[in-house]
Amino acid sequence: MAARAPELARSLLAALLAPALVALLVSPASGRGGRDHGDWDVDRRLPPLPPREDGPRVARFVTHVSDWGSLATISTIKEVRGWPFADIISISDGPPGEGTGEPYMYLSPLQQAVSDLQENPEATLTMSLAQTVYCRNHGFDPQSPLCVHIMMSGTVTKVNKTEEDYARDSLFVRHPEMKHWPSSHNWFFAKLKISRIWVLDYFGGPKVVTPEEYFNVTLQ
């Protein structure tokens, strides 16, 4: 009987921990990026995708519904200096329904991307509807052009004091966890000053969109 005691103890512990483990696995993160499409749209449904022939509007749509993107920089790491180097960056172009098209970021000098940007501020930001329910609901693979994604190149710049409050409000409404990140990391607000945009939303190659076309769009 004594030999079975450890076995019984392990079984009891497993039974007690199982519900907690399941809850952790199925519960979404409290931040917007941990859900199918966020905390701020109550019904969690995407608005309709703009007509695919309207590249500028599609680009603005993708930017506005994206919570994060892949930011590619030119690496300053000794072993891969001069090579492309990408990292995931949380973004926001404005409060829900009020997107400006400017992709704001909250960055720290401790991030490798920031070290790269200090030497060369040119970067490319990629955003995809794969982060929403759109592609999943339609059965589109993330690499498929039908799973709309955009690439925008430009220069990452620190926002000025006038723009800082808007950048803060835009980011914190979508990423509330940011408010509690350690101040010792010297966070600052930045944005991508866009020079060129590519929209991949159908077969046959990307549409090229200029910044003027992009910012002339009024979101409905």
UniProtKB/Swiss-Prot annotation:
SUPFAM superfamilies: FMN-binding split barrel. Induction: Induced during differentiation. Its main location: secreted. Residues 30-53 are annotated as: Disordered. Residues 1-31 form the signal peptide. The keyword Glycoprotein applies. Residues 33-53 have a biased composition (Basic and acidic residues). InterPro entries: CREG, CREG_beta-barrel, Split_barrel_FMN-bd. One of its GO terms (cellular component) is lysosome. N-glycosylated. Widely expressed. It is found in: Secreted. Keywords: Glycoprotein, Growth regulation, Secreted, Signal. May contribute to the transcriptional control of cell growth and differentiation. Antagonizes transcriptional activation and cellular transformation by the adenovirus E1A protein. The transcriptional control activity of cell growth requires interaction with IGF2R. Homodimer. Interacts with IGF2R; the interaction is dependent on glycosylation. This is Protein CREG1. It comes from Mus musculus (Mouse). The gene is Creg1.
